[in-house]
């Protein structure tokens, strides 16, 4: 088995406003995930990172305000993005020049890019000559220069962009044979991230720094999902209900019908994007919708005021690949959820509950259940689809039977052509009524219809709308709880300072517990929203929740204190990975170690799961 190849990072450095983000987006595939700096910290001095392909990551950092030197030293390839003579400030800032010279001295490949803008006074040839002279005067004449024409990233067949892409891939292929992999079965923190943690501990902002690193590690391996919500009205209402937002909340979709496809990333998992897509009145999607990015969505929710018609279904077909999930929400609330999505159970074609399917039968039953949900009977709410499902949709084809002979003779002579076949007509996609309590059946159907990686991303991105969804999401969060627990110990042990371990434990756990509380729909605003929707008395749902909130530093310290006896065990557990950091582990820096942090997380998650189940339980019928 050949050893794993290394991972290469190309860092794009330059002043803000030169189109670095657009350039990286043009070089990358749309299905990869970007790790952005945390919201509210635009000048955090930490690069964003995006995967351009197997083993190649493209980073971006604006200098100023960030200092380029430390990050340039970490890069395997350095790309300078330079302004034109019309730009404000110096064409090449001293700090950028020094970082580039140091990179050349280390033997780091150096590239330079000049982005032409619409209205620039220089031609491409003039810009090339002017930029080459600038590089020569700074001692950087060895850099490969690329001059990109205006709107190069948004047009196909840009020759200079393809040259740049080929140069990056060529450098990456050469370096991957020499560099170690950035990830090989475990999460690794780079020196720059550890330095940022230590700096934040000394100057403030430790919780924000750790939360950003944690969310970045979580999202690095998370699937991208583009989910379209298309219709002529009320698409914003459906998006906000799925995201658990009120109109006017940050990130909420407006009530007005969009004029073009508009993205709304999930607040906790921005790799899951809900798109509001307007539909035209001529029987097809509007030109803007059909030509927007992405060209095809991973799944689509059609929003109609009543029962969908054949024309409604035909309008959205161009926005989807043939096998992509398609479903409808009718906003009048009429009809029932499809029968195959009953709460807590799903029947396989033979009527056996999944709970009775042992061993490998569970996967087979789930697969058959998915087929039944997509091709099975649609009762009330299915409307006027392209065909009728159910018993009327079955056509009996009677095979030829040979006469004479006994049962054994007929059995021996039986062939596939002689059997009786049942042909199912293609059923319309399922239709879910919009109810005040949310769309739990729709969310469950989407998770079953999507590929596993995207289904998992959707599960973590949306707040649960039913007790079973809360249990499923809590189980997924529990399976990933080792990441934040290990991260606190890694950060503290790799940069041992007195008190840093305890500070990392408290800051990271506080941020993680607060995120889980939001993700499970236990914030006061979420509870009040559900109370209003269901017509419950104010405070009724809050009384069912017992996990203390908001998550305070004192609460986290108290929970960690209860685990104080686990500190030694936590340090021993970290000893298995002692080659990654100085001896002593988290215990040497005052932290409680992996086991304690993990125990606090799991205990709190169990409490929050119980609260979410209680809050989402169906209201008792009025007497």
Swiss-Prot record:
Q: What's the encoding gene here? A: IRGQ
Any notes on this protein's domains?
Answer: The LIR motifs (LC3-interacting region) are required for the interaction with ATG8 family proteins GABARAPL2 and MAP1LC3B/LC3B.
Q: Where is the composition biased (Basic and acidic residues)?
A: 342-353
Q: What is the lineage of its organism?
A: Eukaryota, Metazoa, Chordata, Craniata, Vertebrata
| The species this protein was found in | Homo sapiens
Primary site of residence: other
Coiled-coil residues: 155-180
Q: What is this protein called?
A: Immunity-related GTPase family Q protein
The subcellular location is:
Lysosome; Cytoplasmic vesicle, Autophagosome
- Cystine links in this protein are 152-158
């Amino acid at each position: 088995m050949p050893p794993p190849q290394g991972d290469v990072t190309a860092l794009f450095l330059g002043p803000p406003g030169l189109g670095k983000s657009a350039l990286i987006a043009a070089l990358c595939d749309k299905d990869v995930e970007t790790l952005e700096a945390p919201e509210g910290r635009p000048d955090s001095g930490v690069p964003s990172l995006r995967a351009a392909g197997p083993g190649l990551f493209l980073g971006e950092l604006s200098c100023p305000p960030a200092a380029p030197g430390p990050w340039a030293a970490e890069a395997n390839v350095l790309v300078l993005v330079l302004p034109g003579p019309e730009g404000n400030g110096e064409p090449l800032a001293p700090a950028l020049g020094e970082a580039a010279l140091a990179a050349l001295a280390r033997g780091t490949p150096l590239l330079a890019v000049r982005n032409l803008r619409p209205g620039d006074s220089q031609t491409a040839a003039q810009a090339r000559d002017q930029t080459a002279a600038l590089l020569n005067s700074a001692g950087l004449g060895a850099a490969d220069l690329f001059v990109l024409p205006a709107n190069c990233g948004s047009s196909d067949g840009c020759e200079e962009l393809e040259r740049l892409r080929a140069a990056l891939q060529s450098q990456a292929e050469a370096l991957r044979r020499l560099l170690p992999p950035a990830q090989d079965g475990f999460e690794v923190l780079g020196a720059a991230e550890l330095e940022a943690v230590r700096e934040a501990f000394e100057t403030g902002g430790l919780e924000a720094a750790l939360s950003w690193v944690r969310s970045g590690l979580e999202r690095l391996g998370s699937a991208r999902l583009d989910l379209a919500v298309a219709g002529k009205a009320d698409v914003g209402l459906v998006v906000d209900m799925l995201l658990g937002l009120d109109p006017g909340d940050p990130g909420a979709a407006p009530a007005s019908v969009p004029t073009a496809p508009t993205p709304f990333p999930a607040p906790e998992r921005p790799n899951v994007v809900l798109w509001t897509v307007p539909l035209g009145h001529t029987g097809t999607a509007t030109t803007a919708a059909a030509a927007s990015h992405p060209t095809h969505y991973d799944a689509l929710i059609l929003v109609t005021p009543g029962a969908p018609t054949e024309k409604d279904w035909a309008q959205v077909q161009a926005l989807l690949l043939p096998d992509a999930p398609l479903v409808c929400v009718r906003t009048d609330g009429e009809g029932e959820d499809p029968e195959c999505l009953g709460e807590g159970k799903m029947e396989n074609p033979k009527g056996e509950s999944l709970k009775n399917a042992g061993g490998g039968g569970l996967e087979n039953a789930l697969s058959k259940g998915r087929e039944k949900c997509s091709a099975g009977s649609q009762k009330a709410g299915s409307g006027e689809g392209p065909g009728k499902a159910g018993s009327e949709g079955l056509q009996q084809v009677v095979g030829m039977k040979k006469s004479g002979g006994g049962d054994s003779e007929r059995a021996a002579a039986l062939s596939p052509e002689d059997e009786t076949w049942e042909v199912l007509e293609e059923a319309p996609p399922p239709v879910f009524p919009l109810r005040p309590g949310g769309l739990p059946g729709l969310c469950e159907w989407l998770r079953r219809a999507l590929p596993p990686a995207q289904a998992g991303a959707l599960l973590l991105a949306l707040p649960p709308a039913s007790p079973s969804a809360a249990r499923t999401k809590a189980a997924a969060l529990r399976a990933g709880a080792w990441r934040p627990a290990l991260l606190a110990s890694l950060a503290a042990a790799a940069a041992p300072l007195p008190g840093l371990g305890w500070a990392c434990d408290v800051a990271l756990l506080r941020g993680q517990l607060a995120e889980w509380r939001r993700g499970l729909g236990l914030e006061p605003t979420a509870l009040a929203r559900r109370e209003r929707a269901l017509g419950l008395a104010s405070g009724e749902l809050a009384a069912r929740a017992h996990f203390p909130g908001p998550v305070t530093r004192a609460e986290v310290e108290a929970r960690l204190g209860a685990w104080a006896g686990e500190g030694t065990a936590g340090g021993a557990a970290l000893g298995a990975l002692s080659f990654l950091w100085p001896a002593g582990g988290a215990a040497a820096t005052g932290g409680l170690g992996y086991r304690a942090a993990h125990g606090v997380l799991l205990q709190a998650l169990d409490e929050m799961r119980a609260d979410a189940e209680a809050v989402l339980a169906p209201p008792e019928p009025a007497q």
